[in-house]
Amino acid sequence: MGGIVGKPESATSTWMPETKLEAKMVEAMQRRAAEGTALKSFNSIILKFPKIDDSLRNCKAIFEKFDEDSNGTIDHEELKKCFHKLEIKFTEEEINDLFEACDINKDMGMKFNEFIVLLCLVYLLKDDPTALRALEATFETLVDAFVFLDKNKDGYVSRSEMTQAVTESGEGSTGRIAIKRFEEMDWDKNGMVNFKEFLFAFTRWCGVGENEDEEEGEEKN
């Protein structure tokens, strides 16, 4: 996401967000980056995977509650009802932007992993989302992880920043690991990763969504 003006890994002003939502994400992440991070290594992020996974799976009850037709996805109307019930105050335009951004398959419905990404974006963009307080620690860890990777604090993670973050752990074969992880995040292949792309990759790393797909397959057999 975003457009290049000059080299993609230079100063903040050379990388321009393509949408209002992306611009808001970048601005919010830059503010958060100014506060710093307690994480010291990429390994410290990996060690948090199991705990984060368990916490995110607790969102399943919320997801199923608002998936009123039980088709495994939340459509636009169900999302608006969800926001109203959780007292998340967004404008119609903001809801539309969030839905479009998180519906990566463009099938007019959000699967569980897409719903998790949306809730985390809500957490990032709202100053005090009290409705999400139960997930605050988990979402803050995800924000913290992105801040750790974003070495120049411009709101994006570049390939060189990912390599630096992974190689700091000092283990062997870290260069290949860094490139693989970066490619998993950079799904639009533009050389820069925003927070949304990071979240989708992180849910895959933790296994969120994979087990749900397997369970659906078993039910059909």
Which role fits each region the language model picked out?
Residues G2-S70, H76-K80, T91-A101, K106-L149, ...:
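EF-hand Ca2+-binding helix-loop-helix modules
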Residues G72, M108, D154-G155, G191:
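Acidic, glycine-anchored loop motifs typical of Ca2+
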Residues E140-R176, K180:
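Eukaryotic modular interaction domains in large regulatory/scaffold proteins
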Residues R181-K189:
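Long amphipathic alpha-helical assembly cores
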